[in-house]
A protein has these predicted regions:
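Gly/Gly-Pro- and Ser/Thr-rich, intrinsically disordered tail segments characteristic of DNA damage-repair
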Residues: 1-203
Length: 203
């Protein structure tokens, strides 16, 4: 979960041995912490151990994940043709609503950005009603890259769990992404290569 990643310093899915605590005893793991360059002062140790006590470690259930993913893909097909739906991972996907937007939201007085937000809210509602899952939506009237950046950098932190980035937002939002690894496609290895080329920011 986003909170789990924030507390334990994880940017993505990891393994039990990557955690700064022992999953059996819930005690701080100095070995893992040092290996990952994490602090080992008493305040941090107490902080990690307090959170470790209330952290649930659950086994993966890939069959169930896949089944729910297929349910969500079928919901997408209510709003776009199969050719406009692009599964990305077990919990992410793209849907191009260009050709169906005016069909679902025909009001000519609304901007395409407003229509996209309204239709995305409808899709969120359908996903929640059918699966019980709260979904987060990144949108763009420009391209999939900006939609993905909107998802990762803004939508996850908004009350509606939606955000729309377009070309006019590049200077204010894209260039303002604080860490290069928060940009889709840039991992730590790529970041090091970019640093070697003298590139230290998205701008």
């Amino acid at each position: 979960s986003p909170l789990f990643k924030k507390i334990f310093g994880k940017s993505n899915v990891g393994r039990a041995y990557d955690l700064p605590f022992d999953i059996k005893t819930r005690k701080f793991s100095y070995y893992n912490a040092r290996k990952q360059g994490l602090p080992t002062d008493s305040d941090y140790v107490r902080y990690i151990e307090d959170w470790a006590q209330v952290t649930l470690i659950v086994p993966p259930r890939m069959d169930e994940y896949i089944a729910v993913n297929m349910e969500i893909q079928r919901i997408f097909q209510n709003y776009g043709s199969p050719e406009d739906i692009y599964p990305y991972s077990i919990d992410e996907g793209f849907i191009d609503l260009t050709s169906s937007l005016n069909y679902f939201i025909p009001d000519k007085n609304l901007s395409r950005k407003d229509k996209l937000d309204m239709l995305s809210a409808r899709i969120q509602r359908d996903i929640w009603r059918q699966t019980g899952i709260y979904s987060t939506v990144g949108m763009s009237n420009a391209n999939p890259l900006l939609a993905k950046l909107a998802l990762d950098n803004e939508a996850k932190h908004t009350p509606t769990m939606r955000a729309n980035w377009s070309y006019q937002d590049v200077e204010e939002k894209v260039w303002a992404i604080p860490k290069m690894t928060d940009f889709w496609g840039i991992g730590r290895r790529m970041e090091k290569r970019l640093h070697a080329l003298g590139i230290f920011s998205i701008k």
